[in-house]
């Protein structure tokens, strides 16, 4: 991989890997090599959840568990991580197989989100928990400053359902219209039909649940709740 691209990424991350092979593994999708990033992603997911949970616990001493769980879910959900991946310009650094390259995997939200988690796992193995915690908090500084407890942190499907129920409208219906990819790396496309919207709203995700949440979020935007 181009060293200029790698160095630019490390500057954006705010961290330089001592073991460059960990960085390369974190950037490697399973379509490109047998030494891919899924184990690092597993590790990074757990570390991220802990660091964000601890940060919320310290910041909001009077907030109950339900609100903290919803805030954490907002901060660690796939589209937040994918947004962060785009801020790092991860797409230009990913190591993808020919099929994923052809299908635009370098901009797929699920791949960007998974890679951010893999980078967190890689940083932990390259350093220690204190270093990776400081790095995560640096990445999340503005998002942590902006977040607050309340109904806004409920997941999109719940918010959409409550909105419709409050207006005595039928509940939304979700229909799987397409499933792409292999069993280990699928992308679901969902159509969500909502009273008050003339056309179905489309959502995609790496699981049916994530695709439904994405569709519900788009429906909320169209209903001008966001």
Curated annotation (Swiss-Prot):
HAMAP family to which the protein is assigned, alphabetical: RNase_III
A GO molecular-function descriptor: metal ion binding
Pfam short name (any one): dsrm
Family the UniProt entry places it in: Belongs to the ribonuclease III family.
InterPro entries: dsRBD_dom, RNase_III, RNase_III_dom, RNase_III_sf
Reactions catalysed, as given in the entry: Endonucleolytic cleavage to 5'-phosphomonoester
Gene source species: Serratia proteamaculans (strain 568)
Official protein name in the record: Ribonuclease 3
Sequence ranges assigned to domain RNase III in this UniProt record: 6-128
Gene Ontology CC entries for this record: cytoplasm
Catalytic center residues: 45, 117
GO process terms (BP): mRNA processing; regulation of gene expression; rRNA processing; tRNA processing
Subunit description: Homodimer.
Cofactors that this protein relies on: Mg(2+)
Domain of life: Bacteria
Keyword Heme belongs to the record: no
Tagged with keyword Cytoplasm: yes
Binding residues annotated for Mg(2+), in chain numbering: 41, 114, 117
PROSITE patterns assigned to the protein according to its UniProt record, in alphabetical order: DS_RBD, RNASE_3_1, RNASE_3_2
Function as written in the Swiss-Prot or TrEMBL entry: Digests double-stranded RNA. Involved in the processing of primary rRNA transcript to yield the immediate precursors to the large and small rRNAs (23S and 16S). Processes some mRNAs, and tRNAs when they are encoded in the rRNA operon. Processes pre-crRNA and tracrRNA of type II CRISPR loci if present in the organism.
Organism placement in taxonomy: Bacteria, Pseudomonadati, Pseudomonadota, Gammaproteobacteria, Enterobacterales
């Amino acid at each position: 991989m181009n060293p200029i691209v790698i160095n630019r990424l490390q500057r954006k991350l705010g961290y330089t890997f001592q073991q460059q092979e960990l960085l390369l593994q974190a950037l490697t999708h399973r379509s490109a090599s047998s030494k891919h990033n899924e184990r690092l992603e597993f590790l990074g997911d757990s570390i991220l959840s802990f660091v964000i949970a601890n940060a919320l616990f310290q910041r909001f001493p009077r907030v109950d568990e339900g609100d903290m769980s919803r805030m954490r879910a907002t901060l660690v959900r796939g589209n937040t991580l994918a947004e962060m991946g785009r801020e790092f310009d991860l797409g230009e650094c990913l190591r993808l197989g020919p099929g994923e390259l052809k299908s635009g995997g370098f901009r797929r939200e699920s791949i960007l989100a998974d890679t951010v988690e893999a980078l967190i796992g890689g940083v932990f193995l390259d350093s220690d928990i204190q270093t990776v915690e400081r790095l995560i908090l640096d990445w999340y500084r503005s998002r942590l400053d902006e977040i607050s407890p309340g109904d806004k942190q409920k997941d999109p499907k719940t918010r959409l359902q409550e909105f419709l129920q409050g207006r005595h409208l039928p509940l939304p219906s979700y229909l799987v219209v397409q499933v792409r990819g292999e069993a280990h790396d699928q992308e679901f496309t969902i159509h969500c039909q909502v009273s008050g919207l003339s056309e179905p709203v489309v959502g995609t995700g790496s699981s049916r649940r994530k695709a439904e949440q994405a569709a519900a979020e788009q429906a909320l935007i169209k209903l001008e709740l966001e």
